[in-house]
Structure formats: structure tokens, C-alpha cells
Amino acid sequence: MNRVIFCELKTTARMKIGIDALAYYVPQQYLPIEALAQARNIEYAKLHKGLGLTSMSFPDVDEDAASMGANAVLNLFNAEQLDPSHVGRLYLGTESALDSAKPTATYILDLVEQQLAGEYGSDCLRNVDAVDMTFACIGAVDALENACLYVRQNPEKKAIIVASDLAKYHLGSTGEYTQGAGAVAIAVAVDPSIISLGDEIGVATKGERDFFKPRRTHTKAELLVEAAALLGQELSMEEAEIKVTSAEGFWGGNRILRSYVEEPVFDGQYSNFAYISRISEALDHFGTKVNINPALDWDKVVMHLPYAFQGRRMLVNFYLDWMQANGKWQDVVSVMGSDKPADKSEAKEWVRAFSKSDYYRSYVAKALAPAERASSLIGNMYTASIFMGLLSTLCDAADKGEAMEGQTVGFMGYGSGSKAKVFQGTVEAGWAKVGQLNLFTALENRSAVDFKTYELWHNERLTAPLSPEKSGFTFTGLRTEENQEYFRDYTFTA
């Protein structure tokens, strides 16, 4: 009888579900944006004042999505003294996965389980479900949604999501100055201490080609021709084809060689258009479910930030629409001294002028700037960007002694390819514990590297770690044994 009643309550009772704890990991080294600007002959003010960039994190040669994610998850277990038996899910959002079949989440789970074994047993995470979720920068938002659904069905359990990524672009590209890296881990639970999340989500999805990481293909004959030229020899494509056809070992077998690199194929302007379009559609969808006006109802806005000022630059037109909808358009007209022109070109200049007004800047300072603070110092974290924005917002409020309980946070996630999700949450009474993570102190204590060192790292020419004495999980190498080739090994340093 009691069992039946319990099951009924699990599926029908309304309960608060959301973020109960947060933890993070950011690499110890960074490149000052000023150094990159000087090397690339870019005006520093355009990057710093225009895009909000100050520095960008990048992983050491012995760090990757698994080690960074495992460090964030272990930090979460330790800080919260989580009992592994209370955890039922480990979902990873990433676009820096290490394998096409083996989930990177299983590397993370195994590493964390090894460190918890002494207290909880060697199989303490054996009954935890783990999976990777990949949809460009929105994968961890998908993970959060699924984690909430799991906890709603299993209120006695917690779910952990982790976002871990490296944003790496080709040297000299327009994406180079937006690079970044790191991981954020989140515990999702009933009666959360930090933020309770609403049930409704606005979503918009459309297949786009704005940003992707394909498997590149090269014929071995092409590579052989290039190798011959490097050695000062001439070799025709026909001759190369004959040689590789009869070759053994590397040059034999398949005619085509497939490779993968972290640097994406991307179109910045197209991606920005897709971002704006999907967010607009997701906001409309959310509005059919929840009667809100973001300009009035969202105290803070946390969104995916490819660069720190993306939100403030993108949202100005949305903000103007919200002001028209909430009956405050006359305030805007008074600030500008005129209504928005009908002429498209004049209207564009009018909007640009409004974006620089004290009126809009006061909104940015209140709602958007707190999330920008960490992004400016770290760079783009792909899936972790939106959650680092949340962490930044809460830590900023804790530093300033701001009363956050009861405030509404609006979330806008985006992933190229493309998809956007819009949802909201309410800050709960225990939110201030996030201040104990000392995010901004940790970011101040990182080590800067010079541009030459950064280029060596980017081209994978560094042979030793930049920070050899770091604590936590690190990558130690690839196995060479038969049937284990390229399996990744890690170690832990206390």
C-alpha cells in the first residue's frame, strides 16, 4: 500500500528541482589578450573594450576534456561531501570528446570513482548511468534538462552534470581571440539550495552549417606528393598512386586517410545570425508557455557567451522589443529624443546609439555584466560557458554582498548546428555558499604565458607541461599494447 502511494507521489506531486551545488576547474595558464592583439596587429581596444576580452585560458599539454571534467566533478564531491550512493546520473556536455565510441563521461566517472574508493569502495559509482551529450555549445543544457527529468522521477537521488570543453581555433583566424577552456560541474537535486528551475523550456532547432567539426579526408597519394616536395623531390600524383597501391604499413591499405582536429569550420557572421534567429524563436516558444517580459521579470540574464560582450551586443534589439511590449517605450523615446526611424539604415544607427545610452548600460550592468566578468578572463568554454556565467553571476553578487534570494534568472543557451533553449530559475536561500568557491581569486592566481609559448602549445610542439606541479587529474599518455592502442591513461596528484 505504501509503495503504491509513494509511486503516485513521485509522478504527480509538484516539487522544486534545480541546482543544488556548483564546482569548476579552469587551467592554470592563460594568454593575455593584449599579447595576442600585439602579435596579430589588432587594436587592443577593439578586443578589450569592444568584445570584453582580457585573457583566455588554455589547457596544459597534460589536460583534456576528461581531466578537466574529472577535476570539476571531484571538486563537487569534496566540497559538498556527496555520498556516491545518492548519485544516479553523470551526464557530460562536451564538443571536445576524446573518442567516437567510448563516452568521455566514462573516463571521468572512472577517475572520480578511483579517488572516492578509499572512503566509499572501489565500485561506489558502479550504478551511476553515464553518457555524453553533444550539440555544440548547448550539450550541457540538454544534460541539465535530462538530469532534472531524472530527479523528478527519482527524488531520492541526485544527478551530476558536467560541462567540459576546449575552444580552439586556427591561428590567425577571427575565432582565435575567443578561445578558452575549463569545466563546470553541477549537482541537480530536489529542494535545491542554489536555484530552483522552472518546468517550462522554450526550444528552437534548425539544421545549419554555421559551425562544425568534420572528419577531414586526405588521399595518401596527396600526402606522399607533399612529403616528397618537403624532401626536395618531385613526384606526380599518378606516381604516388602507384606507390601507395603497392605499399604496406601506413601507406598501404585504405586509400583515404581521415583525420580530426579541434579547430572548427565556421562562419562567424552566419553563426551570429543563427544564434539570434534561434534565440528569437526559442523566446517566442517560451512565451507561449510562460507569461513573462524578460526586461521586467528577469533580474539576471545568463546566456552562452562566445565572447564576453556577446550578450549585451545581441540583446539590444530584443530589449527594445521587450520595452515596447511592456508599455515603457516612451521611456526609450525620451532617452533618445526621438522615436525609432522607419528607414532601415537610420534605424540601425538609432539602435546603435541606444546601445551606448546610460539607460541601456544600466540594464547591462544589472542583468548581464555579472556573467561577463568570468568570461572576460577565461574566454569561450563552449558547453561550460553558460554555467560559468551563472557561477560568475552568483560569485559577483556574493563579493558585493548583494541579496539574491528570490531573484529570477533567465537562461538562454545556444549550440551551433543549431539549437537554442530558453528557461528560468529562482535563486534559493542557500545560494551564497557559491562565494566560498573563490572563483575570481582563483582566476587572479593563474600564470600568464608569452605569445611564443602559446603558439608552441597551439601547434602541439610543447614536450613538457607548463605547470608540472599541478594537483588533480592529468593525462599521462596513450597505450600501445595490442587491442588497447590509443586508450588514454591518467594519474592523480594530491
Pin down the residues of each PLM region.
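Condensing-enzyme catalytic core mediating Claisen C-C bond formation in acyl metabolism
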Residues: 6-62, 176-277, 281-284, 418-494
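Conserved catalytic cysteine-centered active-site region
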Residues: 45-67, 97-158, 164, 322-385
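Buried hydrophobic packing segments
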Residues: 69-76, 108, 143-150, 282-286, ...
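C-terminal catalytic subdomain
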Residues: 344-353, 361-437, 441-444
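Flexible, glycine-rich active-site loops centered on histidine and acidic residues
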Residues: 155-186, 191
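Conserved beta-ketoacyl condensing-enzyme motif
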Residues: 19, 65-141, 294-318
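Phosphate/pyrophosphate-binding loops at sites that engage ATP/ADP/AMP, CoA/4′-phosphopantetheine
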Residues: 72-88, 280-297, 316-321, 325, ...
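Acidic, glycine-rich active-site loops and adjacent beta-strand->loop/helix elements
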Residues: 23-25, 93-99, 134-140, 163-168, ...
